[in-house]
Amino acid sequence: MLNTIELAKELIKFKSTPHNLEEIHNVTKFVLDYVQKHSKTALQTKILEKNGYPTLIIATQSVKKPALTFYAHLDVVPAKNNDFTPVVKDNKLYGRGSGDMKGPAASLINAFITLVNSNPNYDICLFLPTDEESGGHNCCKHAIETFGFRTKCVIMPD
């Protein structure tokens, strides 16, 4: 498993801006593959999609009604191309999304994997929409209203 800074650097490289659906799908696939590779247990996965925007849901038991949800969005606001080249300077990570929200997403993804690998006796979920920067109408709203997603507790460092 990558350390959190290295994972954040990998996420920052994706130009997952609104309307760049190819990169949005690429970062979603990257995260799914990463979690599956590093989890020691079988997980339930669901990818919801509306208007081309995916929401990745990965859970230990229920992708629809988990007890604890880690939430982070994988999209970022538009930027210059060089902003997608992560740089660590003076022990700080720079790059598009390092603070909102690919840095925090990397923390939650690694925390989720670590918790999953400790065999918790409750259901936990990783909920990753891709349209937060453009209003959230295609992912969260769709997950709640159409899919029926509900959770008891959310950790969201945004």
Question: Which residue stretches match the model-derived regions?
Answer:
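Loop-rich non-cytosolic ectodomains and luminal regions
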Residues: 99
